[in-house]
Amino acid sequence: AAGNLPEDHPRRAEIVTILNKVAKGIKKYQDKKSGLWYQLLDQGSRKGNYLEATASSMFANALLKGVRKGYLHPKYRKTGIKGYRGILKNLIREENDGTISLTRCCAVAGLGGNPYRDGSYE
């Protein structure tokens, strides 16, 4: 989220407004069952799309921190908690050596075929 945004920051209101717009979209595209978010938000469970860890982690963090800091309406807390619980339930794995891994992390993203990406889903 907006981190530690000083009260006297000249663009504070603008940044908080943007965060609220983003939060609305994040809430809209949260997967109802898992609480996570898909790699391509607006494509849902379409073939080839998947519930992705890094965006889900950042979204849950932004919502919860935004509420805690007072940048977001408290209604977003429920969405953030659902995302956090989804991460714990679906994406965290304990390895044989006792370490913890976050699974389903996207290393590279892009749309289109090889060798050039044209922005299409295929």
Task: Locate each region found by the language model.
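Catalytic cores of carbohydrate-active enzymes
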Residues: T17, K24, K28-D42, L88-T99
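CBM-like carbohydrate-recognition segments
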Residues: G48-A55, A60-E122
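Structural helix-adjacent loops and short alpha-helical linkers that scaffold large soluble proteins
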Residues: A2-N20, K27, G66-K82
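Solvent-exposed loop and edge beta-strand segments that line ligand/cofactor-binding
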Residues: A1, E7, R11-I15, Q30, ...
